[in-house]
């Protein structure tokens, strides 16, 4: 059993999270900006099936993270990046990105991105905490991701590939701008083969939470991402110049 939280109640100590299922910490509360910011600041995130479950809060251990400067770009992906004619934008289509990530996929029975989740994260986007990366090719969305930046941490929430390798390209684009955005570490939450192939690693909860304490101020300010459009060669050059 996990504790039931009323809105505004503090989260339990993450060391009390279950090991089966791994990381389940609490249920209840709400998806208000204050609740979400308090949760992410301590390494807790919501993940649940809105059709059959209350809001569930998680803190898995170990934690899947990506040190963006060590992101692995395979030879095939590098060739794809050289050949493709991509345009990259940040925060130009946040709701579209979320809805794209919420679309049904062949290997999944459904989506955890409900309308309530969409509304909550769009509100965080309006407040300057949630952000998106969009990859465009021939005017269509080819890949995307979104997440939350608090201080020097980026908490990745979801990514999608409407076109081949699109989410990988979005992750490389985020890597290319990480220095300018002052992002030190990407929280990928839960291990999966796609992320591990790009250099993700599993970090003990104690080490992960030490990074949170170091890189997230007690009152994290909104972050402002670039509003320009970037052709892929320009973004690659910008990464090398930072």
From Swiss-Prot:
Compartment(s): Cytoplasm
MF terms (GO), sorted A to Z: leucyl-tRNA--protein transferase activity
Q: Please name the top-level EC class of this enzyme.
A: transferase
Q: Which GO terms describe its biological process?
A: protein catabolic process
The record lists the catalysed reaction(s) as:
N-terminal L-lysyl-[protein] + L-leucyl-tRNA(Leu) = N-terminal L-leucyl-L-lysyl-[protein] + tRNA(Leu) + H(+); N-terminal L-arginyl-[protein] + L-leucyl-tRNA(Leu) = N-terminal L-leucyl-L-arginyl-[protein] + tRNA(Leu) + H(+); L-phenylalanyl-tRNA(Phe) + an N-terminal L-alpha-aminoacyl-[protein] = an N-terminal L-phenylalanyl-L-alpha-aminoacyl-[protein] + tRNA(Phe)
Family annotation (InterPro entries)? Acyl_CoA_acyltransferase (IPR016181), Leu/Phe-tRNA_Trfase (IPR004616), Leu/Phe-tRNA_Trfase_C (IPR042203), Leu/Phe-tRNA_Trfase_N (IPR042221)
Q: What is its EC number?
A: 2.3.2.6
Q: In terms of domain of life, where is this protein from?
A: Bacteria
Q: Which UniProt keywords apply?
A: Acyltransferase, Cytoplasm, Transferase
Cellular-component GO terms for this entry? cytoplasm
> What's the stated role of this polypeptide?
Functions in the N-end rule pathway of protein degradation where it conjugates Leu, Phe and, less efficiently, Met from aminoacyl-tRNAs to the N-termini of proteins containing an N-terminal arginine or lysine.
Record-stated family: Belongs to the L/F-transferase family.
State the protein's name: Leucyl/phenylalanyl-tRNA--protein transferase
**Species of origin:** Alcanivorax borkumensis (strain ATCC 700651 / DSM 11573 / NCIMB 13689 / SK2)
């Amino acid at each position: 059993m996990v504790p039931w939280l009323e809105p505004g109640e503090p989260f339990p100590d993450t060391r009390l999270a279950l090991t089966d299922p791994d990381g389940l910490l609490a249920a209840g509360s709400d998806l208000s900006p204050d609740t979400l910011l308090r949760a992410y600041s301590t390494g807790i995130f919501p993940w649940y099936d809105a059709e059959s479950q209350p809001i569930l809060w998680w803190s898995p251990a170990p934690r899947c993270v990506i040190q963006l400067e060590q992101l692995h770009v395979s030879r095939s992906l590098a060739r794809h990046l050289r050949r493709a004619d991509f345009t990259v934008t940040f925060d130009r289509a946040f709701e579209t990105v979320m809805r794209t990530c919420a679309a049904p996929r062949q290997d999944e029975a459904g989506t955890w991105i409900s309308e309530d989740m969409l509304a909550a994260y769009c509100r965080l986007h309006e407040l300057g905490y949630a952000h998106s990366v969009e990859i465009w090719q021939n005017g269509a969305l080819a890949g995307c991701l979104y997440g939350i930046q608090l201080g020097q941490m980026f908490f990745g929430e979801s990514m999608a590939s409407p076109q081949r390798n699109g989410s990988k390209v979005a992750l490389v684009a985020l890597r290319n701008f990480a220095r300018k955005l002052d992002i030190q570490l990407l929280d990928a939450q839960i291990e999966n083969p796609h992320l591990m192939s790009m250099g993700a690693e599993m970090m003990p909860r104690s080490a992960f939470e030490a990074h949170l304490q170091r890189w997230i101020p007690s009152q994290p300010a909104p972050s402002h991402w670039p509003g320009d459009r970037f052709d892929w060669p320009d973004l690659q050059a910008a990464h090398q110049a930072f």
